[in-house]
Amino acid sequence: MNNVRKEPAKRVTTFDHSGRENGWLVELYKDGAKTTAYLTAAAAGAFKGYHLHRVRAARYVCVRGRMRIILYTMGMVENGQTVWTRQEHVLDASNPERLFIPADVATGLENIGAEEGWLINYPEPAYDPDLKDEQVEYTQAELEAGTVK
């Protein structure tokens, strides 16, 4: 029993782009300074996003409630104008599925259930706090206008 131990698990309150609280996240597993798994929670009706990760892919599994995952993938049209293509996926805890989202895909999370929604994410590579510019925030208006940051 000498190997049994408790470790702190950091919990962070999250906010939308206008500063309103929309849920929280908690680090589930860490490898040194890097977070290899975390749970993100969204209040009923709340939206989290949009953002993309330049180097990190996401792997989501919904373990409570129903979550709509809204994705925007960057593409080009003939005149050189950037166009983001929208795609939606629903993850439901009553029918567990994994959703893989590659790097450079803008992602929004919307709780479409009546209870708090929980998503577990296993990012690849693990979240590294030293990569300061790896996450890029977007608004829906910026994505629809073809903005690239």
Predicted regions mapped to residue ranges:
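Glycine-centered loop/turn positions within well-structured domains
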Residues: 107
